[in-house]
Amino acid sequence: MSKTATLADTVCHTSTENLDLIRGGSLLAPALATMQEMPFGRDTTLRRLLPQIPDTYDFVFFDCSPSLESLFNINVLVAVQYVLIPIKVDKNSIEGYNVMLETIQSVREIANPDIRALGIFMTAVETGASLDREMIANFPQMLPELAFHSYIRKNIDVKKAP
């Protein structure tokens, strides 16, 4: 995104009806580099830019890496109302959701009083694995107020994709 381009200029229309994307990588890299150089206000950049996106969207989703140290991820947390938390069926992800909930609480207290955890869902689930089947059965009872009953299966074809 150049200094003259707006966030709306980066919206890519897809062949799927009612689905547009803002691609990361090369399009967002210059904006992220610019944010890194800002002396102040860099954690609120996205919140200031979001009004540039047309009101034609009911939802705007940001797909973030698991790192809570990323400037982009911090910007997202400061800008959004709701957070969907994906977890894999592994020790790090299961322990990490508590850290994420604590982070959301901190962001709510300091920078974004509107942020809430909307829910937690399992991803990369291998339904043939006994641990994954056990998690599918017990997950809703573990987090009754946040757990989604649906999950995303692990798909090897996604890993093979270019």
Segments predicted by a language model, with ranges:
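P-loop NTP-binding core
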Residues: 1-162
